[in-house]
Amino acid sequence: MVRKLSEEEVKRELENLEGWEFCKDYIQKEFSTKNWKTTIFVVNAIASLAEAQWHHPDLEVSFKKVKVKLTTHEAGGITERDIKLAKSIDELVKEILKH
């Protein structure tokens, strides 16, 4: 089983993750996009990345926004898997939004 991080550990990790918020049992971030087409591209890219890491976020999708929520259900909170995926998502979305 994966170890749940303490609140202090999560907050320390989030110092290195711009825009991510700690919300008790999960972390979240909202990404702004240029338009609907870019929004869907971001969602599909996150889905592929998550599938490759076998760790699946909750996504909220609207016209020019994607909100990502990460938690590890089996641990009942945030784990290193969530932090790793958050970092990967940040890198991926940053690259997509450059174009």
UniProtKB/Swiss-Prot annotation:
Q: What class of enzyme is it?
A: lyase
Q: Which Gene3D superfamilies match?
A: Transcriptional coactivator/pterin dehydratase
For this protein, the record's Pfam families field holds:
Pterin_4a (PF01329)
Query: Record keywords: Lyase included?
Result: yes
Do you know which InterPro entries this protein is assigned to? Answer: PCD_sf (IPR036428), Pterin_deHydtase (IPR001533)
Phylogenetic lineage: Bacteria, Pseudomonadati, Aquificota, Aquificia, Aquificales
E.C. code: 4.2.1.96
Q: What is this protein called?
A: Putative pterin-4-alpha-carbinolamine dehydratase
User: From which organism does this entry originate?
Assistant: Aquifex aeolicus (strain VF5)
Which key words are in the record?
Lyase
Which Gene Ontology terms describe the biological processes this protein takes part in? tetrahydrobiopterin biosynthetic process
Xref: SUPFAM superfamilies: PCD-like
Q: List, in alphabetical order, the Gene Ontology terms for molecular function in this entry.
A: 4-alpha-hydroxytetrahydrobiopterin dehydratase activity
Keyword Plastid recorded = no
Family statement: Belongs to the pterin-4-alpha-carbinolamine dehydratase family.
Reaction catalysed by this enzyme = (4aS,6R)-4a-hydroxy-L-erythro-5,6,7,8-tetrahydrobiopterin = (6R)-L-erythro-6,7-dihydrobiopterin + H2O
Entry-linked NCBIfam families = PRK00823.1-2 (NF002017)
